């Protein structure tokens, strides 16, 4: 007997909606300068690529939770960066953080079927909400005040039904830093798992890099990746750490799902986590680029404040919504940016600009803005 119900049709992928902007930006000599997607383009460290090449013949299944070398390297990096005390047994690998974000709600709901709601920032990475949708769950936005989650705005009934609260600090797309200590305390008080996506932590400008794990492990997870830190987005390697019971459960269920980072990638990524020098070089690049574009955009009376963290400028212009501002930038400078609507209705009057193009391309964008 056929089931009767409403079938799921995936929406258009957000960045597929930018083709018109790319066409407008193509009229410039030198072509468009695509700052719409936060994919690093700078070269990774040579020693990481050399290690990957050495392991290319490996064919065996790697441990789903990650090799001990990989987990130890990730733990040692966290301990250096955040003054923590983790071992490789306290965390596990994931196939890049997007995969983890998209699958977490479904896995947690199997364990806590009475909870059916995912809470996430009103302006945020679209996959937080999509992960809830793919699991057949409710997704509820949490308002932001000065870039931070306004926990007092969450309806009591949604708190009772909440499976997880997502946080992202530094934020994609706003670049804001959140009160991680306050989030951890709120989650413990209400019995809601708080998952802090910290993949931009290395690019924190307003303070030292911070992790929610500095405020204890119980009831929280932190999520990290080498995609942004080490310019290795295509490697698809990250890890999660925190609440021992949750980490243990996820290790088991993810193993059943067959989720694993290829062994040669883990070996190369372990070397990336062990080295901080290449990250300092990248920090310098992004800081210079953010300063360059933040200043150049003033020529069009675009407000593009230097972020507290991340490699994004969250921009606005009085009288224009995000699509209109994106159109203006494409027409006047050949820049392709992401309208803020892609990150939630609360972002309608903004655009996100990712400074991930090489220096010469961003200098060209700045020159076009100066001449406009």
Identify the role of each PLM range.
Residues 116, 189-193, 218:
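A short helix->loop->beta-strand "cap" motif at the edges of active sites that frequently abuts
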Residues 145-206:
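Active-site phosphate-binding strand-loop segment of PLP-dependent enzymes
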Residues 2-99, 272-273:
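N-terminal small-domain helix-loop-helix segment of the aminotransferase-like
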Residues 266, 270, 286-294, 304-316, ...:
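Conserved glycine-rich beta-strand-loop-beta hairpin in the small C-terminal domain of fold type I
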Residues 76, 328-337, 343-372:
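PLP-dependent enzyme catalytic core of the Aspartate aminotransferase-like
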Residues 216-287, 372:
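Conserved core segment of the aminotransferase class I/II
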Residues 106-167:
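PLP-dependent aminotransferase-like
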């Amino acid at each position: 007997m056929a089931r009767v119900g409403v079938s799921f049709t995936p929406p258009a992928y957000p960045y597929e909606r930018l083709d018109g902007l790319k066409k407008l930006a193509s009229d410039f000599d030198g072509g468009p300068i695509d700052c719409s997607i936060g994919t690093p383009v700078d070269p990774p460290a040579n020693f990481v690529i050399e290690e990957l090449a050495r392991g290319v013949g490996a064919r065996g299944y790697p441990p789903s939770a990650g090799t001990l070398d990989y987990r130890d390297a990730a733990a040692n990096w966290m301990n250096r960066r955040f003054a923590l005390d983790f071992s490789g047994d306290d965390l596990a690998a994931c196939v890049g953080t997007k995969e983890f974000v998209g699958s977490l709600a479904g896995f947690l709901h199997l364990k806590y079927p009475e909870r059916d709601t995912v809470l996430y920032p009103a302006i945020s990475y679209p996959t937080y909400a999509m992960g809830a949708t793919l699991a057949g769950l409710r997704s509820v936005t949490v308002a932001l005040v000065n870039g931070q989650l306004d926990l007092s705005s969450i309806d009591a009934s949604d708190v009772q039904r909440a499976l997880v609260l997502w946080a992202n600090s530094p934020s994609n797309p706003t670049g804001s830093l959140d009160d991680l200590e306050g989030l951890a305390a709120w989650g413990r008080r209400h019995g809601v798992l708080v998952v802090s996506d910290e993949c931009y932590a290395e690019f924190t400008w307003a303070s030292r890099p911070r992790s929610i794990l500095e405020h204890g492990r119980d009831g929280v997870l932190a999520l990290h990746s080498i995609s942004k830190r080490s310019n290795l987005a295509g490697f698809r390697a990250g890890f999660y750490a925190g609440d021992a019971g949750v980490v243990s459960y996820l290790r088991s269920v993810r193993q059943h799902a067959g989720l694993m980072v290829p062994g040669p990638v883990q070996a190369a990524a372990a070397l990336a986590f062990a080295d901080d020098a290449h990250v300092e070089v990248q920090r310098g690049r992004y800081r210079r680029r953010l300063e360059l574009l933040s200043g150049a955009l003033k020529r069009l009376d675009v407000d593009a404040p230097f972020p507290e963290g991340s490699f994004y400028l969250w921009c606005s212009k009085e009288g224009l919504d995000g699509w209109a501002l994106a159109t203006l930038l494409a027409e006047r400078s050949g820049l392709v940016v992401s309208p803020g609507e892609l990150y939630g209705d609360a972002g309608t009057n903004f655009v996100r600009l990712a400074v991930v193009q090489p220096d010469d391309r961003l200098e060209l964008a700045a020159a076009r803005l100066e001449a406009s």
